A protein has these predicted regions:
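Bacterial N-terminal signal peptides
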Residues: 8-16
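Positively charged n-region of N-terminal signal peptides that target proteins for export
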Residues: 1-4
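A short, surface-exposed beta-strand/turn
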Residues: 101-128, 268-269
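Boundary at the C-terminal end of the N-terminal hydrophobic targeting segment
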Residues: 19-23, 42
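Tryptophan-anchored aromatic micro-motifs
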Residues: 32-71, 136
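Short, hydrophobic/aromatic-rich segments at coil-to-beta transitions
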Residues: 51-59, 83-92
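Short, cysteine-centered beta-strand-loop-beta hairpins and adjacent loop/turn segments enriched
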Residues: 65-67, 94-105, 239-243, 277
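OB-fold and OB-like single-stranded nucleic-acid-recognition modules
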Residues: 155-293
Length: 293
């Protein structure tokens, strides 16, 4: 799982509040903090010409961060509306607090783009004591407006830096962003009409681009496609539950795929050879994606 220094900085700040609340027996602290969290200040930045916000967001999500061995978490794009230019990044992280107490932090951050300007606004930032699996134990403590404002500023600064990466570094995250199956499915789901979705895919061609993702195996069969021995029929299930699963056809000559069991979750790597669209759908819905190892 990926960690970011952003998560750890804010997480440590909230750990102090959660531990203090528990040790002091302040049962109403959560409500008081919620009341203080309503007026957080959004942070803003500029999108340079020739760059787009999504690769910069993915650069935040896939950064290795502080390298702390005491934390574990995941940061992912939970929602994307390409027509509106709005994106939501969600995060869950488990870490030991100052007194050695395991705690979990959940956050949801909205990032919106209007022409060449972007803004970052934290909608949720809360901490609670937890077990080793992240199951909550006790009350959630919502961050103050000050805490959320600090996170907004940290993330906006990080996104701005990522928007000005070298061409080589930017291209790496551009590839990650636009070959992400959740992103591809979101385009079809959120576009107001087919033509807008078609235009997006025309501007962001993904065929022959490298990708890797985790999929749920349905079956492994002999391939009828030329140059490949096996066809693995899979299903990609987006983290955003509002999106439909995507059928994935994975073509390989690797004998190891024979050992893939139905309903098992496996990681596949390869190049996108074709995206198949449902031309009869009201939206530009993806019917399946073909991947070649």
């Amino acid at each position: 799982m990926k960690k970011t220094f952003v998560a750890l900085v804010v997480f440590l700040m909230l750990c102090v509040a959660a531990v203090s609340a528990k040790s002091s027996g302040l049962g109403s602290l959560g409500k008081n903090l919620s009341a203080l969290s309503r007026n957080a200040k959004a942070a803003e930045g500029t999108v340079p010409e020739g760059r787009e916000i999504l690769p910069a967001i993915f650069a935040v999500m896939y950064s290795d961060g502080s390298g702390s061995e005491k934390s574990d978490g995941i940061m992912y794009l939970s929602k994307a509306d390409f027509d509106a230019g709005t994106y939501t990044v969600s995060q869950k992280i488990i870490m030991k607090g100052p007194l050695g107490v395991l705690q979990r932090q959940d956050s949801e951050i909205d990032i919106s783009v209007n022409e060449s300007q972007f803004s970052v606004e934290t909608k949720k930032l809360a901490t609670c004591n937890s077990d080793k699996n992240g199951n909550p134990k006790g009350d959630w403590i919502e961050a103050t407006a000050s805490g959320k404002s600090k996170l907004n500023k940290i993330l906006a600064d990080e996104i701005s830096r990522n928007l000005n990466l070298s061409d080589k570094e930017y291209a790496e995250f551009e590839n990650k962003a636009y070959t992400d199956f959740g992103v591809l499915q979101s385009v079809a789901s959120t576009s107001s009409n087919k033509l807008k979705a078609k235009l997006w895919f025309k501007k962001h061609p993904v065929e022959k681009k490298s990708m890797e993702t985790k999929v749920l195996v349905s079956s492994v069969d002999e391939s009828k496609a030329e140059n490949y021995a096996y066809k693995v029929s899979c299903l990609y299930v987006p983290l955003d539950k509002k999106l439909d699963p995507v059928i994935v056809n994975y073509y390989s000559n690797n004998d190891e795929v024979i050992g893939f069991k139905p309903d098992s979750l496996v990681e596949i790597k390869g190049k996108i050879s074709k995206i198949n669209f449902d031309e009869y759908s009201m939206t530009y819905k993806i019917s399946s994606i073909d991947i070649e190892e």
